């Protein structure tokens, strides 16, 4: 959050009237405070939804920035007065309640994975002892077959669909 807040301050010092918007996807609840920006946006199906929210997103920030965005994200003229609930308020609120604990568990698991894979000789980012600003952990296998075998091994030990064997395919939107 400190680096993002510093960028926000630099932008505001350079250009008055500019809105700084941060897509905080996977970054929510990973630090003591959220980054400073005019507006933070994110998905409820990731960190803040705690695995419970089936859909949705959020906008938060300065009153003016949120007001301007609200007229683009809802029906014309309704702004922040309404929002899509789709009959899912219960799951969304349960997700918000559970999210800090679930994100903490994800961070611990990422630290552990980084430590284990570092000890096994793999290149990881972030390193096990580095500060994290999200719940993403990268492990570089160095070759496609290693990644494929890893995914298949995880799936074979999973509680759900362990009989399924994941196979690579040309997924739209990804070149590699």
Where in this protein do the model-derived segments appear?
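Conserved C-terminal alpha-helix-loop-beta "cap" of PLP-dependent enzymes
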Residues: 118-176
């Amino acid at each position: 959050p400190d680096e993002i807040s510093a960028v926000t301050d630099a932008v505001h010092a350079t250009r008055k009237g500019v809105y700084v918007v941060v897509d905080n996807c996977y970054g929510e609840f990973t630090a003591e405070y959220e980054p400073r920006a005019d507006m933070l946006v994110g998905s409820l199906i990731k960190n803040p939804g705690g695995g419970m929210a089936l859909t949705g997103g959020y906008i938060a920030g300065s009153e003016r920035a949120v007001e301007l965005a609200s007229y683009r994200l809802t029906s014309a003229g309704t702004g922040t007065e309404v929002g899509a609930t789709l009959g899912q308020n219960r799951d969304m609120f349960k997700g918000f309640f559970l999210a800090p604990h679930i994100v903490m568990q994800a961070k611990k698991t990422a630290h552990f994975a980084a430590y284990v894979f570092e000890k096994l000789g793999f290149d990881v980012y972030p390193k096990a002892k580095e500060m994290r600003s999200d719940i993403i952990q990268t492990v570089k296998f160095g070759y496609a077959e290693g990644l494929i075998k890893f995914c298949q091994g995880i799936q074979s030990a999973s509680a759900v669909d362990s009989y399924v064997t994941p196979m690579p395919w040309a997924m739209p939107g990804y070149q590699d």
